[in-house]
Each structure stands twice: as structure tokens, then as C-alpha cells.
Design a protein with these regions (language model features):
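Extracytoplasmic ligand-binding site segments that recognize negatively charged/polar headgroups
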Residues: 53-62, 80-167, 326-338
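Hinge/cleft segment of the Venus flytrap/periplasmic-binding protein
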Residues: 83-84, 89-90, 97, 109, ...
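Exported/periplasmic ABC-transporter solute-binding proteins
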Residues: 183-190, 201-273, 285
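Hydrophobic alpha-helical segments within soluble ligand-binding/sensing domains
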Residues: 48-81, 100, 167-171, 216-220, ...
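Beta-alpha junction/loop-to-helix N-cap segments that form part of ligand/metal-binding clefts
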Residues: 1-40, 48-52, 193-200, 360-371
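Hydrophobic alpha-helical
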Residues: 1-21, 105, 125-222, 343
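Extracytoplasmic "Venus flytrap"
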Residues: 1, 90-99, 187-193, 321-349, ...
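Short beta-strand elements at the ligand-binding edges of bilobed clamshell
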Residues: 33-67, 88-92, 226-241, 356-358
Length: 371
């Protein structure tokens, strides 16, 4: 499977197999079953993964949408047919985060169907009549009124070159869906804000249809003031810090949780309410926060370092180290507009000299050929 990796390189003759390795954003796993790649996660004694709690975030996104429906029950059903219809932009059918978010939405809205490996996360194509086997019609009760909920359409947003999570494909999809489904579309849902904003800008804002995404990208957070329904912050500020902090600690040979669970000399430390560590999976997970009209002003700058870990390390005790870091899909909106800018701010604070390599989201050779 394709994964985003960051490898640290020191001067000297340390073999690559012994250098610290931190996977981030995309957890090494089987793209079909979602099973973790334990071999990749145990490459050596200084190998870790940094991401976010995908299931907790998926549940939050689903709950956010269900709560919105209940709060706007008098206006949400645009054509008054008693069916709350939604369309869903799926980022990557083989990506664990995409799978979790699709499942979270379907679970919260009652449209989920259980399969042999849990809730079915496959796209339905079009499902105007409710006959698709991948989902079922759900129900939501609001003050004595029962609404049916139907997934009218969903597809993986993969472009002709094979890149997934593609905003352009999502924009084309919403145009096609709007043409065939019209005012039966009451809600637009996306696995991320990149696709969500593409659909919001091309159709749903003009038509007053609430759109929900994921990632709390700056443009999506700002768009909440203009009718974007909401998004989920995966605490990218915490993730980016963890990604580089683990490398810093491994390179320095100090306790791996220095500046994480325990304060470093500069006072950097994370509290347990923003992350946790799963030892069996060798994975650090940031916790998610729902961003809605009630709190979006607190999230307007998605590239601001997290306050409790924004203290500069002393260069005399933490001298400059060199790191090779690749981003598997540099065209991805979240990775390019939020994650990398955060990394670039933390690399200065942590005295790391980083060589950033952007991949095309399709072939590993696009990155490894530049090693």
C-alpha cells in the first residue's frame, strides 16, 4: 500500500534500516481489508505512526450532521417529500480514514448496512429509489415527526490519472448529481474539506444546501460563515508536532515521550485530552473536535502551531539534525495547505533541517526515485 513516510538521516554511516522512521497521515494497512501492516509499523525500534483517532472523528462527523438535521428540521427537507436525501463524496475506497468516515456518517444517519467486515463502506453510485444494497433507508425522529434518510448517491473521487480525494472530480460529480436528483438533495457530505469545498463552491452554496467536510482546512472554516455546514478538526497542529517530535527524540536518543507526555527543557508538553498512544499499534493518535457555526472562529488559522508545544528548543542542547520527509500526495488540499505548513513551522522550533519531497499520490517510485 502507498503510505506517507518521513525518514531521518544523520551524518555518519548509520544504515537506513536503523534510522528513525515515522509514518504519518496514512497508516500502513491493507487497502482492501484495512488490516494494519504490522511489519511496516515495526520496521525498527524507532518506527512509529502519527495520525488521529479515525473512528472517534468519524463518529463526530456523523453526529454533527444528525444534530444539524434535528436543529433545522423545519427547513432541511427542500422538496417536502419527507425524505432527507444526501450525497456523499468518498475520498479513497481503500483508505482507512475514508472508510471510517463513510461508516461514521452511515451509522449516525441510520443508513448503514452490516457486511462481513463491519459496516459496508462501498459507494452506491446512484440510489434515487432506495434500492441499493450497500445502504438502507434510515429514520430520524424530530419532535414527533419521523423523516426518512436516504443516501441518494456516492462515489469514489478518483480522477483519470488515478489520484484519489480529487476535488475536481467531486465538483463534476455534484454537477451531475444535481442535474439528475435536483431538489431531492438536502445535504452534501464529503470525506474531506478539499472535495467538500469544491462541491460547495460549484453548487451547494448557491443552492443553500448545507455541506459537511472533514479536516478544518482554513477555507472550509471560513466558509461556515457563508453556509458551509461544518467540519472536523483532526488536530493537525498536534499531529504535525508529534511527527517531528518523535524524530527529534529518536535522533537525540532521549526518552521517546520527551516533550510529549513529559515536559522538555523548553516546557513543551501535550495533555492527555488531545492525544493518546496505542502501544500495540506503535501509533500516536490526535483527538478530533467538531467545528460548527458555534465555534468556528476558534479554528480560523489551521496552520498555527499548538500553543503548549510552540516553544523553541535550545540549539546548544538540541543541535540541527537533517530529515528526509515525503508527502505521498502533494496535491491533497489538507496535506499541502495545512499539514506541510505546520511541519515547516515546527521544524524551525525543533531545529530540524528537512528536505520535503512531494509525491503524486499514485506511485511510490515518484518519491523513492528521489532518494
Amino acid at each position: 500500500t502507498s503510505a506517507a513516510t518521513s525518514t531521518a538521516a544523520e551524518s555518519g554511516t548509520v544504515e537506513n534500516k536503523d534510522k528513525p522512521l515515522v509514518w504519518f497521515n496514512r497508516q500502513p494497512s491493507n487497502s482492501t481489508t484495512g488490516e494494519l501492516d504490522t511489519e511496516a509499523l515495526n520496521f525498527n525500534g524507532n518506527t512509529y505512526y502519527v495520525g488521529f483517532d479515525a473512528n472517534q472523528g468519524a463518529e463526530l462527523q456523523g453526529k454533527m450532521i444528525a444534530d444539524y438535521i434535528k436543529a433545522h428540521a423545519d427547513t432541511i427537507d427542500r422538496n417536502g417529500d419527507g425524505v432527507i436525501g444526501y450525497v456523499l463524496a468518498i475520498g479513497d475506497i481503500g483508505h482507512n480514514d475514508s472508510i471510517a468516515r463513510t461508516r461514521g456518517v452511515r451509522s449516525a444517519l441510520g443508513t448503514a448496512v452490516e457486511g462481513s467486515s463491519g459496516i459496508v463502506s462501498d459507494p452506491v453510485g446512484t440510489n434515487a429509489d432506495g434500492s441499493a444494497t450497500q445502504v438502507q433507508d434510515g429514520t430520524i425522529d424530530v419532535d414527533g415527526t419521523t423523516f426518512s434518510v436516504r443516501e441518494l448517491a456516492s462515489q469514489e473521487m478518483k480522477n483519470s490519472a488515478g489520484a484519489t480525494w480529487d476535488a475536481g472530480t467531486a465538483s463534476n460529480a455534484i454537477s451531475a448529481w444535481a442535474s439528475s436528483l435536483g431538489d431531492s438533495i438536502d445535504i452534501v457530505i464529503s470525506n474531506n474539506d478539499g472535495m467538500g469545498m469544491a462541491m460547495f463552491n460549484s453548487w451547494s452554496q448557491e443552492n443553500g444546501v448545507p455541506t459537511f467536510g472533514y479536516d478544518a482546512n482554513a477555507d472550509a472554516v471560513a466558509a461556515i460563515a457563508d453556509g458551509y455546514g461544518g467540519t472536523i478538526s483532526q488536530h493537525a497542529d498536534v499531529q504535525a508536532y508529534l511527527t517531528l517530535r518523535l524524530l527529534r527524540n529518536a535522533l537525540d536518543g532521549v526518552d521517546i515521550n520527551t516533550g510529549i507526555a513529559t515536559p522538555d527543557a523548553a516546557g513543551n508538553v501535550l495533555s492527555s485530552d488531545v492525544y493518546y498512544y496505542n502501544e500495540d499499534e506503535r501509533s500516536y493518535y490526535a483527538l478530533n473536535v467538531a467545528v460548527t457555526a458555534d465555534n468556528y472562529t476558534d479554528f480560523t488559522d489551521s496552520t498555527k502551531p499548538y500553543g503548549p508545544v510552540s516553544n523553541q528548543l535550545d540549539a546548544t542542547t538540541s543541535p540541527e539534525k537533517s530529515v528526509w520527509l515525503d508527502i505521498y500526495n502533494s496535491a491533497d488540499n489538507f496535506l499541502s495547505a495545512t499539514y506541510q505548513p505546520l511541519l515547516e513551522k515546527y521544524d524551525d522550533l525543533l531545529n530540524l533541517k528537512i528536505d520535503y519531497i512531494g509525491g503524486d499520490g499514485q506511485t511510490e517510485a515518484n518519491i523513492t526515485n528521489r532518494l
